[in-house]
């Protein structure tokens, strides 16, 4: 299973091999900005799709994996400032510069939620199990229940509100695991990274960044051992979330709302602001991009750049987004417009009353597998073959035992005869 890098610029988007750097596919006519693109493998249409909100207006481009040109152009109710999709493929969320939050049901295109929830521009959206988190330049982090959003949008209020940041929040990462064990990481222009517990809504730790650095983006490895902060200077700060204790081994840093100063460990190669970060599946490689068009692949154990990704036709367009994916589930056949299934158009107006609506569900083709009857027959034949072989071995052992008994009886008879002769001679 290979890994790919998907990245977007203000001129297009590409997918390249993470380890070789070879170009896999290219998407044309894409003009986007940071936090305005998301690649989704699991979609109602059954095809992996790249969603990319455009910077020139209230428009979103949808790209099919095996098609270079735009597959769908969707008119939005407002120009977006950030975009996110749930990994299950059910929800698509967008935030605007006015502070409005939009949530669509992808299978129907229905706009289930639309409201101004922040005082300033929404900067980042992220889904977790049953929750949607939104951050803004107003320094607040809000958590929303997706169930309440879909069932009672008029009276829906944030179930989580975090206001400890002093300046605008620029990025947010949601950790893995179920909701009760999930941690949320936020980074702000107040030069702090804060770690939150979703279950208790408590602030766990505050990590202060160097005064000379202004954070722009954030990444956390899947095991939540290390976080990486991209900065406007081009540096990437690496912050370990565990310390080594001589008595107890590894211990987590901070806790109890404590403040921790980040170390001076930095990955230095970019000469301009880092715009996006992404980690490989095993967290041994870090992909970073900047606003001058450079994309670097870092080998984290050695903290060296192992590869630089070149844009097509030697262009150097500002990179706005990077994401790592695996090739599992990606189609290999060519794009066929006759069989391709398109998503329903996203609605721009929220319905006042709940109503029945159709949803798009693509039934996947039947996979070629061994029939149950054939499998059962093979098991029966195997058991029968094993039984016949075992019975033959039993018969063979019984014959050998019978021969041994016969030989023993003959030897005993000879021994008794010789012993009697010896007794008479005495």
Swiss-Prot record:
Its main location: nucleus. It comes from the Eukaryota. GO terms for biological process: DNA-templated DNA replication; rRNA processing. It comes from Yarrowia lipolytica (strain CLIB 122 / E 150) (Yeast). This is Pre-rRNA-processing protein IPI3. Belongs to the WD repeat IPI3/WDR18 family. The keyword Nucleotidyltransferase does not apply. It is found in: Nucleus. Keywords: Nucleus, Repeat, Ribosome biogenesis, rRNA processing, WD repeat. Component of the RIX1 complex, composed of IPI1, RIX1/IPI2 and IPI3 in a 1:2:2 stoichiometry. The complex interacts (via RIX1) with MDN1 (via its hexameric AAA ATPase ring) and the pre-60S ribosome particles. WD repeats lie at residues 75-114, 117-154, 164-206, 269-308. Component of the RIX1 complex required for processing of ITS2 sequences from 35S pre-rRNA. Signal peptide: none annotated.
């Amino acid at each position: 299973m290979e890994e790919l890098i998907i990245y977007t610029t203000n001129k297009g988007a590409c997918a390249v091999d993470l380890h070789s750097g070879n170009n896999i596919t290219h998407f044309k006519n894409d003009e986007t900005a940071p936090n305005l693109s998301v690649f989704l493998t699991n979609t109602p249409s059954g095809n992996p799709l790249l969603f990319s909100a455009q910077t020139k207006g209230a428009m979103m481009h949808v790209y099919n994996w095996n098609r270079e040109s735009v597959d769908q152009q969707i008119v939005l109710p407002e120009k977006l400032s950030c975009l996110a999709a749930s990994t299950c493929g059910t929800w698509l969320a967008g935030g605007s510069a006015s502070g409005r939050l939009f949530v669509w049901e992808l299978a129907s295109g229905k706009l289930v939620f639309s409201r101004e929830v922040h005082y300033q521009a929404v900067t980042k959206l992220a889904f977790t199990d049953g929750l949607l988190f939104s951050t803004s330049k107003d320094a607040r982090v809000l958590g929303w229940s997706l169930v309440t959003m879909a069932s009672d949008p008029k009276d829906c209020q944030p179930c989580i509100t975090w206001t400890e940041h002093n300046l605008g929040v620029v990025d947010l990462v949601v950790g893995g695991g179920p909701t009760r064990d999930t941690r949320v990481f936020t980074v702000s222009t107040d030069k702090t990274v804060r770690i939150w517990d979703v279950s208790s809504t408590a602030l766990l730790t505050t990590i202060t960044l160097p005064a000379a650095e202004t954070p722009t983006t954030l990444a956390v490895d899947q095991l939540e051992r290390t976080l990486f902060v991209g900065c406007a200077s081009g540096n990437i700060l690496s912050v370990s979330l565990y310390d080594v204790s001589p008595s107890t081994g590894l211990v987590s840093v901070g806790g109890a709302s404590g403040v921790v100063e980040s170390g001076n460990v930095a990955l230095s190669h970019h000469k301009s602001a880092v715009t996006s970060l992404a980690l490989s599946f095993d967290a041994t490689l870090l992909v970073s991009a900047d606003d001058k068009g450079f994309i670097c692949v870092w080998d984290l154990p050695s903290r060296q750049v192992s590869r630089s990704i070149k844009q097509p036709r030697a262009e150097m367009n500002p990179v706005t987004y990077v994401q790592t994916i695996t090739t599992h589930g990606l189609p290999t056949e060519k794009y066929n417009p006759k069989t391709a299934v398109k998503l329903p158009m996203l609605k721009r107006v929220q319905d006042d009353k709940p109503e029945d609506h159709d949803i798009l569900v693509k039934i996947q083709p039947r996979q070629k597998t061994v029939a149950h009857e054939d499998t059962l027959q093979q098991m029966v034949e195997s058991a029968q073959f094993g039984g016949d072989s075992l019975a033959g071995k039993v018969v063979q052992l019984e014959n050998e035992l019978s021969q041994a008994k016969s030989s023993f009886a003959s030897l005993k008879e000879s021994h008794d005869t010789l012993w009697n002769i010896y007794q008479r001679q005495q």
